[in-house]
C-alpha cells in the first residue's frame, strides 16, 4: 500500500513514462528482470530503486518489412512403372516452371531459382493377410528452391500455386519464410534507443526523490522479440517470426544508473 500511495503522488509527466510501457515490453521486463524482485525496494512496470542506484527497463519497439523471401515447391508424379513416373514428372515440372515464370518468378538479378535433384522411389502395397504384393507404384519428386527480394510477389504466387492441381500437377508448397537482410544493423539501433529510453525513465523517477541520475553502472541486454504486428507473445529465449512480411521488433535492456 505504501508503494501504491507513493506512485499515486507522482506528477502526470513522471507517471506517463511508466504508463506508456506497452504490454509486450512489460512482459519482457518481467522475464529479463524477474530475478531482481526479491532484493528490490520498489518494482513497478520495469524499474527498481535501491540505495545510491536505480535500475530501470529501457525499451524500443519499431515496425519494419522483410526484404528476403525463401520458398520451396515440391513437384510429384506417380506412375505404374519407373519410366511412366519419370515422364509424367517431366511434364509436371515443365508446367510448374512455366507457372512460376508467368507469375514473374525466374532466375535473375533479384531472384534465385534452384532445381534440386529428381528422386524416384518404388512403393509396394501388400495384402494384409497373405503379404502378397497387390500393387506397385513409382513416385518421382523434385524440389524447387526460390530465394527472392520481391517478397510480395512470392506471397501472391504462394496463394495461387494450388491452381496447378487443376492441370493435374501434384505440388506441395512450403510456407514462405520472410526475413530481413539488415537485421544486425537494426539490432544495434534498437539497443541504442532502448538505452536512451532507460535514461529518460530513470530521470523521471529520480526527480521525485530530489535526486539526479549519474553514470552508468550496469547493463543487462535482454533478448529481441521479432513478432507479427501488435503481438503480445514473448519468449525468454527471444523470438523471430518468419510467417509475415511486416513485423515488429522489440528490444529490452535493464540498465542500472548511479543516483546522486
Predicted regions and their residues:
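Short, charge-dense linear interaction motifs
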Residues: 2-260
Amino acid at each position: 500500500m505504501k508503494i501504491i500511495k507513493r506512485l499515486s503522488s507522482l506528477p502526470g509527466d513522471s507517471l506517463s513514462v511508466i504508463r506508456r510501457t506497452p504490454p509486450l515490453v512489460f512482459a519482457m521486463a518481467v522475464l529479463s528482470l524477474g530475478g531482481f524482485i526479491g532484493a528490490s525496494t520498489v518494482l513497478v512496470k520495469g524499474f527498481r530503486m535501491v540505495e545510491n542506484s536505480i535500475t530501470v527497463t529501457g525499451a524500443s519497439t519499431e515496425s519494419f518489412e522483410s526484404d528476403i523471401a525463401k520458398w520451396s515447391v515440391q513437384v510429384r508424379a506417380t506412375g505404374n512403372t519407373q519410366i511412366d513416373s519419370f515422364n509424367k514428372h517431366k511434364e509436371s515440372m515443365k508446367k510448374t516452371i512455366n507457372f512460376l515464370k508467368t507469375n514473374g518468378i525466374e532466375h535473375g538479378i533479384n531472384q534465385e531459382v534452384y532445381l534440386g535433384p529428381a528422386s524416384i522411389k518404388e512403393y509396394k502395397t501388400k495384402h494384409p493377410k497373405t503379404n502378397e504384393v497387390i500393387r506397385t507404384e513409382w513416385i518421382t519428386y523434385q524440389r524447387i528452391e526460390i530465394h527472392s527480394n520481391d517478397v510480395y510477389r512470392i506471397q501472391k504466387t504462394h496463394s495461387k500455386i494450388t491452381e496447378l492441381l487443376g492441370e493435374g500437377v501434384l505440388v506441395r508448397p512450403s510456407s514462405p519464410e520472410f526475413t530481413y537482410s539488415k537485421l544486425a544493423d537494426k539490432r544495434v539501433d534498437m539497443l541504442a534507443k532502448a538505452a536512451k529510453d532507460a535514461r529518460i525513465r530513470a530521470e523521471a523517477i529520480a526527480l521525485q526523490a530530489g535526486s539526479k541520475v549519474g553514470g552508468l553502472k550496469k547493463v543487462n541486454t535482454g533478448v529481441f522479440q521479432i513478432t507479427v504486428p501488435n503481438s503480445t507473445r514473448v519468449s525468454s529465449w527471444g523470438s523471430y517470426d518468419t510467417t509475415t512480411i511486416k513485423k515488429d521488433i522489440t528490444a529490452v535492456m535493464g540498465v542500472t544508473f548511479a543516483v546522486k
